Amino acid sequence: IDPYTRSVSDVYQDLFGQGSFIGKGIYDVDAFERSTGARFPDNRILSHDLIESGFARSGLLSEVQLYEGYPARYSADVKRRQRWIRGDWQLLPWLLPRAPVRGGGRERNPLSALSRWKLLDNLRRSLVPPALLAVLIMGWFVFSHPLAWTLGVLALIFGLPLADFAVGLTGKSPGVSSLRHLRAQLHSLGLQLLRDALTLAWLPFEAWYCLDAILRTLWRE
C-alpha cells in the first residue's frame, strides 16, 4: 500500500483510524516535540515521514486536496527516489524490539505493529524492481517455460491499470454520458499503460538504483 500517492481513500485511516504522514499537514509543535523528543539519532535518517507519524500519530483528511511540484526530468525523479529508499532502509532498526535513540544506545521500541508494518511495506516496495528483474532472468535462463514467467511479470505490471479501468467503468457520475465516461476511462488507461511500458523498459536501471541505495545504506549502517 503506497501511502504517498493513494491518499483519496487511505486503507490505514479507514480500517485502523491512523493515517500516514505524507509531508503536508497541520500539527501541534509542542505535541510533536513531546512525542518524538530524543527518539532519533542526529543526522541518521533521510526518510522521516513514516517514523514520525508512528510516534506522533496522524489522521488523514481524504477530502483535502494539496498540490506540490514533481521533478520535471526522470533523472531528478530517480535521485529523489533513491534518497527515499536509502532513508527507508535507515529505519530498519525500528523493526526490532529495541531501537536506537539520540545520544547512542537503544531502548524498547514503542512503535505499534501497524507502524512497523508500514516501515516493512516501504522496504518491500523498494525490492519490487530487483525482484521482477530477477524473475525475468531466472525464467529466461534457469527455469523452464520462459514465456509463462514473462507473462506473469507482464501481468503484475499491467494488471493493475486494467483492473482500475474495469472498476472505473462502473463509477459513472450522474449527468455524464456513457460515451464521454468511456472516453475518459480509455484516455486514463492509455496514459497509465504508457507509464507502465516505460517502467518495463527502465526495469534494469530501476533494479540497479534500488539495489545500489539498499546496499549503500546497509554498508554504512
Located regions from the model:
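Non-transmembrane catalytic domains and loops of membrane-associated enzymes and transporters
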Residues: 1-200, 206, 213, 217-221
